[in-house]
Amino acid sequence: MTKKIEVAQIRVLFLGIWRFLQHLRLRLVEDQINIRAGHLAYVTLLSLVPLVAVTMSMLSAFPVFKGIRGQIEAFVYENFLPAAGDTVQIYINEFVGNASKGTAVGIAALVVVAIMLISAIDKSLNNIWRTKEKRSVVVAFSMYWMVITLGPVLVGASLVATSYVVSLKLFEDDTFSGVVPLFIERLPMLFSVAAFLLLYMVVPNQKVKFLHALLGALVAALLFELGKKAFALYVTQFPSYEAIYGALATIPILFVWVYLSWMIVLLGAEITAAMPEYLDYESSFDKDEASTKT
């Protein structure tokens, strides 16, 4: 009897997952996330140098982050730009160096272009959530400015805190000798989950449940980590881009990776937004079924 109940529960669970995946598939087709990911990839490449320039300027304004700029750059390029990270880092640093020598008008233009990227992300995610109420211009600008100014500071502070914790004498003990390498190895995954969770909780102009956002963040972070490894393997083992483009191979490689990254981000957002819709549908379906039985 107990085994029959367990089998029935497992069957209901898998049936529920299947229904959710069907609902998610319809959502993905309707929202055309491949087209949105292409748009965001284009805007990202256009805004990449201005965003990095503004970020580094914000970090240089705080003396405590002066010594960790190199660590932040290395961490980002190694963990978020597979295979072509070193080459991209050289070019972007050169572009940022040129951009930082500009006038006040030029720097203001960089900030505007960086805000364009954040605005595009905001609009794309709110479209996924079917948000009807738009933020006012003042509120939207305040949020974008907060992301540009506080975002780099929070990233720098988290890396400083991590470096401090890892350097504590407590972790020099043999008991914790294996903990530090394991923690450092999992750090990119933890940062990815935290970033996706924050994105899915804060950007939509409506209330998002923590567990729904956490599910989307976990799926997106896992796909992001797997995507990094798979993409790096493809680029290194099947160097077709280098054979075709030669010295310019970094450009299409970067564009393809940015496009895939946005596909993953939007997929996580779709999962988060689809959860309450699916649960409401299941709840109403159960009520209708119960009413027909009575």
Curated annotation (Swiss-Prot):
Alphabetic keyword roster: Cell inner membrane, Cell membrane, Membrane, Transmembrane, Transmembrane helix
TM stretches of this protein: 45-65, 102-122, 137-157, 179-199, 213-233, 247-267
Main location: membrane
GO CC terms: plasma membrane
Family: Belongs to the UPF0761 family.
Keyword Transport: no
Matching InterPro entries: UPF0761_bac, Virul_fac_BrkB
Membrane-protein topology: Multi-pass membrane protein
Record bears the keyword Protein biosynthesis: no
Subcellular location, record wording: Cell inner membrane
Name of the featured protein: UPF0761 membrane protein Sputw3181_0272
